[in-house]
Amino acid sequence: MRMLFRSFLATEAAGGIILIAAAAAAMLVANSPLAPTYFELLHARLGPLSLLHWINDALMALFFLLVGLEIKREFLRGHLARWSDRILPCIAAAAGMAAPALLYLAFAGGTEGLVRGWAIPTATDIAFAIGVLALLGSRAPASLKLFLTTIAIVDDMGAVAIIALAYTAAISGPALLAAIVILAAMAGLGRIGVRRLWPYLLLAAALWLAVLLSGVHATIAGVLAALAIPLGDEDDSPLERLEHGLHPWVAFAIVPLFGFANAGVSFAEIGAEQLLAPLPLGIAAGLFLGKQAGIFGSVRLAVALGLAQRPAGASWTQLYGVALLCGIGFTMSLFIGGLAFSDPLLIDEVKIGVLGGSILSAIAGYALLRWTGKVT
């Protein structure tokens, strides 16, 4: 289990650095002579969907499949298997989602049509955050990395629930019934002891199509499929084999491709009025101010009330640095922004807010942790 966790951190750290590079490349291309080609390519039709929709609806389903696998493993056999281990990350993640949402509504809630974006600043990008933390090397104790990872995993659970409940279109009964039948078939395979992966993967593909047609966002199929893939007591369970095989593809290909496809925003026609509009301000404030206030404040309160203990080997200053890093929303924030709004102008404002809040959080968190001494 320790080797699996170390491998996970290493993959997330390297993947996070590649994600940062992909986002930077997207912004450079979007503000270069290649910009028309970049945007035309993203909106080119490939069968029933555009390239951008294939990335966001199909490839990101694999990202959510991995998220589901990680959540299931952590809660059944990992660092969240005991209730005592869940208390602090759950409190921190819950407060770290509520505070940004409230701050967003304070900035943007009064503007017509913007309430739908309340969930955008609630997310934490684990790959991006771990990538920044990895740059600190030994200055970041293992307990700090574990704390950040567990918060992000619980945060992902909240994000999945929000996507399923708040951003679902009109429901198609027959397609939803088909999805339920397929999911039951996957669970049945586990009950009768099927350990080969291919039957689960075939049914997972059918589940994705059924969920897509049902009106629920197709990426939720990834999480549902993960819950049906068995995690036994053996070290080579179907879940662990799939997680191990999927991790490099998601970390080094799918998430960077998503970042490159979604982070590109042209600043040619963006002025101070758009930068200071309620939507980007609400998102940036939610990520940079709301996340740190919600997470750090709730952790201090939980420890003071005796509900949980401070992570061993980490100072309060270091925990505040982690709270800052949790304001890096990026992947999930951009994803939710695409679900909340369809107007290209609003999508650009979402990108500005997410990039602004995430960059501020990354710089502030890194700087604080970089200059933080050892715990005494």
Swiss-Prot record:
Q: Could you tell me the keywords of this UniProt record?
A: Antiport, Cell inner membrane, Cell membrane, Ion transport, Membrane, Sodium, Sodium transport, Transmembrane, Transmembrane helix, Transport
Q: Where are the transmembrane segments?
A: 8-28, 49-69, 87-107, 117-137, 140-160, 162-182, 209-229, 248-268, 270-290, 321-341, 349-369
What gene is this protein translated from? Answer: nhaA
Which PANTHER family does the entry link to? NA(+)_H(+) ANTIPORTER NHAA (PTHR30341:SF0), SODIUM ION/PROTON ANTIPORTER NHAA-RELATED (PTHR30341)
Query: Which family would the database say this protein is a member of?
Result: Belongs to the NhaA Na(+)/H(+) (TC 2.A.33) antiporter family.
Q: Extract one GO BP annotation from the record.
A: regulation of pH
Purpose: Na(+)/H(+) antiporter that extrudes sodium in exchange for external protons.
State the protein's name: Na(+)/H(+) antiporter NhaA
User: What is the membrane topology noted in the UniProt record heading this document?
Assistant: Multi-pass membrane protein
Instruction: Give the species this sequence originates from.
Output: Rhizorhabdus wittichii (strain DSM 6014 / CCUG 31198 / JCM 15750 / NBRC 105917 / EY 4224 / RW1)
Give me the reactions it catalyses: Na(+)(in) + 2 H(+)(out) = Na(+)(out) + 2 H(+)(in)
Transmembrane helix among keywords: yes
